[in-house]
Curated annotation (Swiss-Prot):
It comes from the Viruses. This is Protein U54. It comes from Elephantid herpesvirus 1 (isolate Asian elephant/Berlin/Kiba/1998).
Length: 480
């Protein structure tokens, strides 16, 4: 059994439209050839992984093979599960060895993946162990959203089975729960959005306490009382659980209809660094611009291959070493026999979905995936897939696009005076900023979707760039 003994987030994501995270995990145990195992990494990543939709894409230095699409995220466990296998004939034995995995997570722009509608409690809601009516601070952020801070002291953790919460091997073997009622809150709290539930740094000196995550497993609201089940997610049987917790949450006071219909993944936008900061979004025809695709780094602005809700995956000819692919029926260049070896440069990350007519595996280690950009298509091999660039709507690095699409007037970050900001810690201000970022992306996403459509048949020319001359570069992830 492979067991993670330690983990560390080595790169914090800051991408606008995706997240790129590197996790270092210290492993212990033996893995034999031909048998896959589930590795649970109890990393708290939900601040930057959309709806918990994570893709593990491996790393060049790994001994382990990671299934490209076999990743599950558990909000209950506060971590992600992935399938790992041994690609070698001999057993792999790990003795506290560090393995690095690259995680890729698209954002899908709901107000928050932590969105919880606060319905009145049912008769089966557990009896609360405490009623909190003091140590409550409420700040109004706008007409629709309020910030609430609550201090919970003297928590006595119990087995979650007492509270009818889900159980199972992947739903919390080392978790403890605590039901509590918070009294005298503002009326008409509709939903809980972003929140933080954290311990005080000076409440426990144990290292095991540091690795325990805390979430809200269940929430209800009736009249002026908020009912919560707090859950501590330990990482081992020696886990330590804090006695005092601080809750900071952003609540809406009414329904936000724009958050009801959120697609699984939007196609990429044509954005360069500061376009959203200028409140404009350039709409670019990829066949009439220079679009340079490079290996993903945490500085990449955006490049998406849409998933099954948006994509059209087609067969192409099988790629062979020594040949550069372009579109079927177009120019194909054969390299001379004495050419230098083709050396892959870095890893490329793409979301791929199995189609019945494609005839290919639905996952492959990312280090084996290479890509080529032709005039109108992005080609992935050895998966033998093509993506139309007008469907991908890739990045345009033009500093002066022919025309821009002015975004609608939507909620921006409210302007708070300095005296008001003194009420919040750095973490709380970051929480508020992340929430309004996600709110803005949701409105932007909905607006752009009304102006674009799925493409079928003939090539769709984006109307803002009809006068531009063709200048598409042909790029591959190779050095010669």
């Amino acid at each position: 059994m492979i067991t993670p003994l330690w983990f560390h987030v080595t790169q914090q994501p800051d991408g606008t439209y995706f997240n790129f995270i590197e996790i270092a995990v210290r492993l212990n145990g033996t893995l034999v050839n031909g048998i896959s195992q589930t590795l649970l990494v109890p990393a708290k990543l939900w601040e930057h992984t959309g709806l918990g939709k994570i893709y593990v894409v491996g790393s060049m230095e790994n001994k382990l093979d990671v299934d490209f699409c076999a990743v599950r995220y558990s909000d209950i466990l506060g971590g992600f599960c992935m399938e790992v296998s041994n690609p070698h004939d001999e057993p792999l034995t790990f003795n506290h060895e560090v393995q690095r995995f690259i995680l890729f997570s698209p954002q899908i722009y709901p107000i928050s993946y932590q969105f919880q509608v606060l319905r009145p409690p049912s008769v089966s809601f557990p009896k609360c162990k405490a009623n909190v009516s003091s140590d409550i601070i409420v700040h109004s952020l706008s007409d629709t959203y309020v910030f609430i801070k609550i201090q919970f002291n003297g928590i006595t953790w119990e087995d979650p089975k007492k509270f009818d919460l889900p159980t199972g091997p992947l739903s919390g073997p080392f978790w403890m729960s605590y039901p509590v009622a918070v009294l005298n809150l503002p009326r008409k709290l509709y939903a809980l959005h972003h929140y933080l539930l954290s311990r005080h740094t000076d409440t426990c000196d144990s290292e095991n306490c540091y690795y325990t995550n805390y979430i809200v497993s269940r929430s209800c609201f009736h009249k002026r009382t908020l009912y919560l089940i707090l859950t501590g997610i330990g990482t081992s049987k020696n886990a330590c659980y804090a006695k005092d917790l601080l809750f900071c949450g952003i609540f809406s006071t009414s329904h936000v209809p724009e958050g009801d219909d959120i697609p699984q993944l939007d196609p990429a936008y044509n954005v360069h660094g500061e376009s959203l900061l200028r409140d404009t979004l350039p709409i670019i025809n990829p066949s009439a611009h220079c679009n340079t695709f490079q290996t993903f780094t945490h500085d990449t602005v955006a490049l998406f291959a849409p998933d099954e809700w948006h994509s059209s995956l087609l067969n192409v000819a099988v790629w062979r070493p020594g040949k550069i692919l372009t579109l079927p029926g177009t120019f194909v260049q054969n390299l001379p026999t004495d050419h230098k070896p083709i050396i892959p440069v870095g890893d490329a990350v793409f979301l791929v979905t199995q189609q019945l007519y494609a005839g290919h595996p639905n996952h492959i280690p990312a280090r084996k995936i290479r890509a080529l950009v032709s005039k109108t298509y992005l080609i992935l091999f050895p998966l033998n897939l093509t993506f139309r660039l007008d469907e991908l709507n890739p990045i345009c690095f033009s500093e002066k696009p022919q025309s821009k699409l002015t975004l609608p007037q939507i909620d921006k970050h409210p302007s708070f005076d300095q005296d008001f900001l003194k009420n919040f810690s750095i973490d709380e201000m970051q929480l508020i900023s992340q929430f309004f970022d996600s709110l803005r992306k949701m409105y932007t996403s909905n607006y752009v979707r009304t102006l674009t459509k799925r493409f079928h048949g003939n090539w769709n020319r984006w109307p803002s760039c009809r006068n531009h001359q063709f200048n598409q570069l042909l790029c591959a992830f190779y050095s010669f």
